[in-house]
């Protein structure tokens, strides 16, 4: 029988079998191929996601390009498998998406392809997840909360107490059960980390004339025009990387950290004179209550019992909880010592649910579902579902918060302007970028050190192949000799990514060296505070205090004076040198002085009552 005859006979047999409802046996090789293909797809995804947590010293642009390329390759190989029919457009963010139509990332939220900025979003989620889970570890969770421990009748936990901070919270809130106590304790831990490690910047409240001077383009909205404003100038990952942010930047990181822990929260906003919304305090959902955390004050809003945290219902019922947040003349001689919110403003609030173009996109929903458990973070979330879980309160409306969209608009304006940096007028308007961001964006080992800190990598590598966070920042405390000798130090050049190309002339090489030397001067100024933060997080309060005292006297650290002073006060508080802590926190020359003085007041009252 010829090959053609045999093939036709086989085809006829298959047809008969199918018509009878029977199927021919599947070739086992096909099963093996399917398994191999599935494994290849997953390996491809794992390799790409490994870049998020990698210590390979990528340039930022190289990192974002590699992430987008890898994710899009994975998305293309998955094809129709990725088309999750259960995904639905988020109803509450439709208007935000339409209003942000000029953004590619908003326009493409229904697509499966990834954008170059998505790598930063994934890295941000990874960093915040590691921070939130690390600081809520019961074994270390209690360490920063000396003030609250003393307020809880000088509580001294027995060795067999598994979650001492939860016990402190329950003592300060006698009506609270274990689950609620755990939620509040975890919220305190994430909030406290953010306040300690993100130095508070002043609000960007520009006059009309200053706004026009700062304008980068003709867009109608301030954010899209590149005009600085409160809360939208930095992505959360940038605030983490730079170690600075305004009170809204702090709140965003706090809320995202809570989300990683499965805790709902909103930004409660008051109404301004022109009807605009003014962010006030983060309301953490615990049962039917909003527990209040003020990121500008740097404190949970105190309740009636010393050391307790107030709820929205409580401050509405007892206006004195708000008015008592104003400072006395003995505490401060500042021109305005009033707390920035009045009790009557609390009758008409808006609960803002934090969202972003990425979090409601189809691509992030599919990616999160495909990630293995050990790599999974909270990438996608429905604003509508969060809103449905919020406690209903009279006089509290609910809206999605547009700040995440405004950030994309602002950063797009900056990116477009940087392409026109040869224009002297535009270049002058970018001074803030060059002064505060450029040197960090281009200094790879700095970013690696920060990432090690976020992960809590404080232990020694037994094989000696990788530095921990403390060692990384110690290495960044460059001596003047190291900076001066960079041009002849080939080892240091290699570590900093300086390579003299064969075709590069001496003048260009020397120009590059001088640029890096300038960056080294700025980096060593920053590294001292970051090193002290590592020691504090690692429970070494003496080491933190010693470092802070030393660097306070260094030249050029004025940029970090707020962070140094606050962390030194907190270190002395933990070391039980309460008088010294009160004195340090009582300085009224800092951006966070108002909240520090309230903390000093609380600490003094607690110590006097022991």
Question: Which ranges hold each PLM region?
Answer:
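"A position-specific structural signal for the A-helix of alpha-solenoid helical repeats
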Residues: 526, 530, 563, 567, ...
């Amino acid at each position: 029988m010829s090959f053609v005859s045999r093939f036709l006979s086989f085809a006829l047999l298959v047809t008969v079998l199918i018509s009878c409802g029977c199927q021919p046996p599947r070739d086992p090789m096909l099963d093996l191929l399917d398994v191999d293909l599935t494994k290849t797809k997953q390996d491809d995804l794992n390799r790409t996601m490994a870049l998020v947590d990698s210590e390979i010293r990528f340039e930022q642009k190289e990192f974002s390009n590699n992430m987008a390329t890898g994710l899009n390759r994975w998305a293309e190989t998955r094809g129709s498998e990725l088309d999750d029919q259960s995904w639905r457009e988020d109803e509450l963010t439709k208007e935000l998406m339409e209003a942000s139509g000029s953004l590619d990332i908003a326009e493409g939220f229904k697509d499966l392809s990834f954008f170059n900025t998505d790598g930063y979003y994934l890295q941000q989620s990874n960093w915040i997840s590691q921070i939130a889970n690390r600081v809520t570890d019961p074994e270390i969770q209690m360490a920063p909360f000396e003030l609250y421990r003393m307020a809880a009748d000088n509580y001294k936990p027995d060795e067999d107490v598994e979650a001492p901070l939860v016990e402190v919270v329950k003592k300060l809130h006698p009506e609270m059960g274990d689950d609620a106590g755990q939620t509040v304790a975890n919220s305190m831990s994430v909030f406290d980390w953010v306040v300690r490690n993100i130095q508070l910047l002043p609000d960007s409240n520009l006059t009309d004339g200053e706004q026009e001077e700062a304008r980068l383009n003709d867009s109608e909205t301030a954010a899209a025009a590149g005009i600085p404003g409160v809360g939208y100038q930095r992505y959360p990952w940038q605030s983490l990387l730079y170690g600075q942010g305004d009170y809204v930047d702090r709140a965003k990181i706090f809320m995202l950290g809570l989300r990683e822990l499965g805790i709902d929260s909103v930004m409660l906003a008051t109404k301004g004179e022109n009807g605009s919304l003014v962010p006030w305090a983060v309301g953490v959902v615990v049962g039917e209550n909003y527990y209040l955390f003020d990121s500008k004050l740097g404190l949970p809003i105190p309740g009636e019992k010393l050391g307790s945290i107030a709820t929205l219902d409580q401050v509405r019922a007892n206006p004195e909880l708000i008015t008592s947040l104003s400072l006395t003349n003995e505490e401060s001689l500042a021109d305005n010592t009033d707390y920035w919110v009045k009790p009557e403003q609390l009758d008409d609030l808006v609960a803002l649910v934090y969202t972003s173009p990425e979090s409601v996109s189809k691509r992030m929903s599919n990616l999160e579902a495909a990630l293995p458990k050990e790599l999974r973070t909270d990438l996608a979330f429905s604003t509508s579902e969060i809103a449905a879980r919020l406690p209903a309160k009279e006089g509290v409306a609910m809206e999605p918060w547009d700040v995440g969209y405004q950030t994309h608009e602002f950063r797009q304006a900056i990116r477009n302007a940087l392409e026109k940096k040869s224009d002297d007028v535009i270049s002058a308007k970018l001074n803030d970028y060059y002064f505060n961001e450029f040197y960090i964006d281009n200094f790879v080992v700095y970013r690696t050190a920060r990432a090690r800190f976020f992960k809590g990598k404080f232990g020694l590598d037994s094989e000696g192949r990788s530095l921990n966070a403390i060692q990384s920042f110690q290495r960044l405390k460059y001596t003047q000799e190291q900076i001066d000798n960079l041009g002849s130090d080939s080892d240091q050049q290699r570590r900093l990514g300086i390579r003299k190309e064969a075709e590069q002339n001496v003048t260009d090489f020397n120009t590059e060296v001088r640029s890096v030397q300038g960056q080294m001067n700025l980096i060593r100024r920053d590294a001292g505070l970051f090193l002290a933060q590592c020691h504090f997080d690692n429970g070494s309060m003496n080491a933190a205090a010693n470092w802070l005292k030393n660097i306070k006297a260094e030249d050029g650290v004025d940029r970090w004076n707020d962070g140094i002073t606050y962390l030194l006060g907190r270190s002395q508080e933990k070391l039980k040198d309460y008088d010294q802590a009160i004195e340090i926190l009582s300085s009224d020359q800092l951006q966070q002085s108002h909240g520090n003085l309230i903390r000093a007041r609380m600490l003094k009252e607690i110590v006097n009552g022991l």
